[in-house]
């Protein structure tokens, strides 16, 4: 469908009735997102069987409560696989609740950082206090976004607005993530926090978030590692005066856009990454096949390194699709590389026949496109009518350097 919204400034504080701020002192930081009115909430989490204490705590909180007011998040420590970790997760929530003067069961939490190390609660508590002090003075989406960064190179934020019967609805979000990105969040280190002022039921919000997640965060790959802490939350406080039942399609479309933009920012900021890769697979027999093939492309280390080196080695694309498990006919499929910015296209394979070979204009054009910082790979399987787009990044020297020194 055509875009029914406009992009606006403000991130999580763009919707009515939300405040946010954060504070970070070198390694450790904390962010607070607060709704001035009661809100409903939805969340999706990592499916990793080794999961962090705040994941376990917030899953339970979401199931057993219907009113929410805040999200608290810390960076620098994952609070995962440590003795006393659940108590620390509860203390983090308690600290935020006391400062905001709301019940503890109205606070959702998240953590990101090193796994297996005890939470320095004295430091984290101080960061939460500083975030609260900041939020009482002013609302700062940028500070909140920066406070949850770890190996991120830049803060990630987006917001949109659309109108329903003369009233404005806004959706805003922030995210963090650069490494350990291959989420699979069925019920997503990568953290995403989204706010909206629409009036919506908890059930509808959960369904909308799941659909948006499936099309965005669950299609994002940096390094193929699934974090123990992946989490996405949405808070909806009804302050716009617009009901979801009056704009289901428009809201779901806008929420998916916000989620996709955050997901693309995350993979663009893959540790040491220089290029964004979008892989779209058309003509698949099933949606599952389209996802298998597109994810296989962006997950391929050989393809990632080829993109890093601006090498139009289309054989790596063909191989990745071939081993993905998707149904295909090697004698009847297309591969195209295009530049997202200029829409230049190079046809590499057509109906199973090689088009780009040494010395051909197609290969020369592909070489030029591969030098760009946003590259789209298109594969038509010619097996059916389903499609999927996955997001990834190149893989270079800096990824090894950053991750070999992460705990030192």
From Swiss-Prot:
Top-level taxon of the source organism: Archaea
Gene Ontology CC terms: cytoplasm
Marked site positions, Involved in the stabilization of negative charge on the oxyanion by the formation of the oxyanion hole: 112-113
Active site positions: 189 (nucleophile)
GO molecular function annotations of the record: glutamate N-acetyltransferase activity; L-glutamate N-acetyltransferase activity
Keywords on record: Acyltransferase, Amino-acid biosynthesis, Arginine biosynthesis, Autocatalytic cleavage, Cytoplasm, Transferase
Chief location: cytoplasm
Reaction catalysis annotation: N(2)-acetyl-L-ornithine + L-glutamate = N-acetyl-L-glutamate + L-ornithine
GO biological process, one term: ornithine biosynthetic process
Site (described: Cleavage): 188-189
Pathway connected to this protein: Amino-acid biosynthesis; L-arginine biosynthesis; L-ornithine and N-acetyl-L-glutamate from L-glutamate and N(2)-acetyl-L-ornithine (cyclic): step 1/1
EC numbers on record: 2.3.1.35
UniProt cross-references to InterPro entries, sorted A to Z: Arg_biosynth_ArgJ, ArgJ-like_dom_sf, ArgJ_beta_C
CDD domains, alphabetized: OAT
Amino acids binding substrate: 150, 176, 189, 271, 403, 408
Name of the top EC class for this enzyme: transferase
Location(s) in or outside the cell: Cytoplasm
Purpose of the protein: Catalyzes the transfer of the acetyl group from N(2)-acetylornithine to glutamate, forming N-acetylglutamate and L-ornithine.
Assembly: Heterotetramer of two alpha and two beta chains.
Entry's family note: Belongs to the ArgJ family.
Protein name, UniProt field: Glutamate N-acetyltransferase
């Amino acid at each position: 469908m055509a875009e029914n919204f406009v992009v606006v400034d403000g991130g999580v504080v763009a919707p009515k009735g939300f405040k946010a701020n954060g504070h970070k002192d070198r390694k450790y930081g904390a962010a607070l997102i607060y709704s001035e009115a009661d809100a409903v909430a939805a969340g999706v989490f990592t499916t990793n069987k080794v999961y962090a204490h705040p994941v376990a705590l917030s899953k339970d909180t979401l199931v057993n409560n219907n009113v929410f007011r805040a999200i608290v998040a810390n960076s620098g420590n994952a609070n995962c696989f440590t003795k006393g970790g659940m108590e620390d997760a509860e203390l983090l929530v308690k600290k935020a609740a006391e400062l905001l003067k709301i019940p503890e069961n109205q606070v959702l939490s998240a953590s990101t950082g090193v796994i297996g190390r005890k939470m320095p609660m004295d430091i984290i508590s101080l960061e939460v206090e500083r975030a609260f002090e900041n939020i009482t003075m002013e609302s700062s989406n940028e500070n909140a976004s920066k406070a949850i960064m770890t190996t991120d190179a830049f803060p990630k934020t987006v917001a949109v607005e659309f109108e329903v019967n003369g009233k404005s609805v806004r959706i805003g979000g922030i995210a963090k993530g650069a490494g350990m990105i291959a989420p699979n969040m069925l019920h997503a280190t990568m953290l995403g926090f989204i706010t909206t002022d629409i009036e919506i039921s908890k059930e509808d919000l959960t369904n909308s978030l799941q659909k948006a997640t499936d099309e965005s965060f669950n299609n994002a790959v940096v390094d193929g590692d699934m974090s123990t802490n992946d989490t996405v939350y949405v808070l909806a406080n009804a302050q716009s005066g617009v009901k979801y039942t009056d704009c289901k399609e428009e809201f779901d479309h806008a929420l998916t856009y916000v989620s996709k933009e955050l997901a693309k920012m995350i993979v663009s900021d893959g540790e040491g990454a220089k290029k964004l890769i979008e892989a779209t697979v058309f003509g698949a027999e099933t949606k599952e096949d389209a996802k298998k093939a597109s994810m296989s492309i962006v997950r391929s280390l050989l393809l990632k390194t080829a993109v890093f080196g601006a090498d139009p080695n289309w054989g790596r694309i063909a191989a990745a699709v071939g081993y993905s498990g998707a149904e295909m006919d090697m004698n009847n499929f297309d591969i195209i590389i295009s530049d997202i910015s200029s829409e230049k296209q190079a046809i590499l394979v057509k109906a199973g026949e090689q088009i780009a070979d040494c010395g051909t204009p197609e290969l020369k054009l592909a070489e030029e496109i591969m030098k760009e910082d946003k590259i789209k790979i298109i594969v038509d399987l010619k097996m059916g009518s389903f499609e999927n787009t996955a997001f990834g990044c190149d893989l270079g020297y800096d990824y090894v350097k950053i991750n070999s020194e992460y705990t030192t």
